[in-house]
């Protein structure tokens, strides 16, 4: 049964007379406490925060003196007391509440400045189970939620970045806060505790290998408010989930303006793709536009890999995102600045390369500090009307699969390498996806078509266009391997690839008409392998 409100009007201005400060992150807390003290505010605090305030020479009352009860159980119990929560939750204009405060000696608390145990940091660093559990804050969220609920009278601050706004308000208005400010801080407080609990609940799900928990919470902290979303009429923000996976969310912007919504989406797609190619094996470059690759290649050098990737579709690469699996060097930078590019992301960047990229001040340059592990577990989420689709990350690797030769002719060693190369890329192309590859270089990419035949034909046409632009006698699809991210439901898609010049095929298999497709491959002396793993991407 719902609780009925007494509907007592909230005051606009509330004078801050007593403040409770209890923080794990002590950034600027002494400066804030100093301002509060000068305004005549009585300071209450706990543990390490109280010690820091006292050492700064400020008068502070330990919460244990308010509760008349010591901290116990290694600090697990210190603020969970009626004298604290009564002071936070009391409705100051309710006669019954005021009488209860007098009867039990409860002092009103007008301001709570609280941040939480660093559970996210401990989890990210891979702390052991007991240590991680010990860093689940109990008293902090309880006080935050109590303060936020009673924002009609209590100001709650959970983020050091909000201290300046609080100080400005207090100094401008004789130590008072407005209802609008208290309401805004309360909304942020509930968002903070929700995100905190989301990380905890997801950690438990991972620890217990619960793939589909009954409740799924996804939380994040705003990294930046964006100018707009996918289109100018859409609002957008970029949130960090706390996952320490190298990529666009954790990368350092070395130069260039703020990334747009579409830049972030494309950069993530590009970097996840190029990470499929281990840097110790060969330099690799991926060029992405609208979250689909328009060219991918390996090479003896990073610069050569870039040139080979660009050759696949230099027209579509204009205004694209370039991802590298090795440190960006000067030679590669000189090649990249020849063409208009939106974003470059690499594990690192040499000083010489930075100087070269600086010639293009609007070109965004990101250093990610490493490559994401393509085999690592994780989650992806997508909203639908009234719901949320959550699935495990597609971390299947072709190197880990048992490839089954299903045709009379087995692939040559080079064909097999090209098959694997193409199948890695197919995983990152919107379905239906068809990729032609030869000698570690994409020859043509067909993406996002409703018909697999159309994807094969588009990829072949792209290859012909590239051949003409490069002055080649024939497209690179001649003698290429072709990859399909899902099975061929009919032989027509395979025949389209064969018509383009493919001599080897890699696909998951699993169609009711697999034998028809195998027969067509045998008829044209084409080698084909089944992976047994599909890579739909929508």
From Swiss-Prot:
Residues 8-158 form the MGS-like domain. GO terms for biological process: 'de novo' IMP biosynthetic process. Pathway: Purine metabolism; IMP biosynthesis via de novo pathway; 5-formamido-1-(5-phospho-D-ribosyl)imidazole-4-carboxamide from 5-amino-1-(5-phospho-D-ribosyl)imidazole-4-carboxamide (10-formyl THF route): step 1/1; Purine metabolism; IMP biosynthesis via de novo pathway; IMP from 5-formamido-1-(5-phospho-D-ribosyl)imidazole-4-carboxamide: step 1/1. The keyword Transferase applies. One of its GO terms (molecular function) is IMP cyclohydrolase activity. The keyword DNA damage does not apply. Its EC number is 2.1.2.3, 3.5.4.10. PROSITE patterns: MGS. It catalyses: (6R)-10-formyltetrahydrofolate + 5-amino-1-(5-phospho-beta-D-ribosyl)imidazole-4-carboxamide = 5-formamido-1-(5-phospho-D-ribosyl)imidazole-4-carboxamide + (6S)-5,6,7,8-tetrahydrofolate; IMP + H2O = 5-formamido-1-(5-phospho-D-ribosyl)imidazole-4-carboxamide. CDD domains: IMPCH. One of its GO terms (cellular component) is cytosol. It comes from the Bacteria. Keywords: Hydrolase, Multifunctional enzyme, Purine biosynthesis, Transferase. The IMP cyclohydrolase activity resides in the N-terminal region. Belongs to the PurH family. This is Bifunctional purine biosynthesis protein PurH. It comes from Agrobacterium fabrum (strain C58 / ATCC 33970).
